[in-house]
Structures are given as C-alpha cells and as structure tokens.
Amino acid sequence: INKYYDAFDTCNHPLNKGDLTPFAEMFLSLVDISMKQLYDEIKNKLDKFNFYRNLCPKLPNADHKDIERLYYVLIQAALFSENGISQKELESFFNVSYSSVRNKLSSIPADLLIKNTRERHAYYMLDLDKVDIMFSK
C-alpha cells in the first residue's frame, strides 16, 4: 500500500507534470510479483496433489473404484478449497442420490474425513495430515 501512495505522490509532484509512468511501473511491478507468487502456490499445490493422487489406491477401501474416485475428489477439495466439496457437488459428480453419497462417505474412515458445516450444508475434504501420518509409519 505504501508503494501505491508513494507512486501516486510522485505522479502528483509539480515537477513531474502529471506523468503517470512511476504509478504504472509500480502497479505493473505489483502485478508481476502477484503472478509469480500465484504461480509458485499453484505449482506447490499441484505437486502435493500428484503426491496424494498416487496414494489413492493405497487408502482404505480404495479397492472399490468409486471410493478411489471419492478420495481423488476429497484430495482436490483439501488442497484447492477453503470449505471442501459439498454434498450436492458430490451427488452431481457421481450422478447419484444423497443416500448413495452418504454410503460412499461412510466407506472412508472417520479420522480421514473432515466435515465442515456452513449454513446447514455439509462440506467434505480429506485430512491430508492424517494421510501423511498413515504412510509415515
């Protein structure tokens, strides 16, 4: 924020006669820094995703393809979502009913599943810390 105001003050200085170049340079520099940080964050999350995706077949009950796919989705929810994936989104993803999703979720050990409730809606994600512990033994 200070850089923003400094650049703005520089542009408003009488000797600069309203030249907006310093402001534009500062703004482009902020965009550049933000893009690099975003790239690094996405690359880091993608590396983690690939790591956990390769563990999917080794997770409990993953011998059933639907449960392995559920793990796959719950890993994405853990890495790329604040709240997780909603019950409705899971129903849509699997093209099944509420009770079918509940059945699939019950196949995942409770200690591996994080359930968040927001405005009376359930959101799910995989507890990646617990997965790490499971495979570190």
What does each model-found stretch correspond to?
Residues 95-109:
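Short amphipathic alpha-helical interaction segments
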Residues 1-41:
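Phosphate/pyrophosphate-binding active-site loops
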Residues 71, 80-93:
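Short acidic, hydrophobic short linear motifs in intrinsically disordered regions
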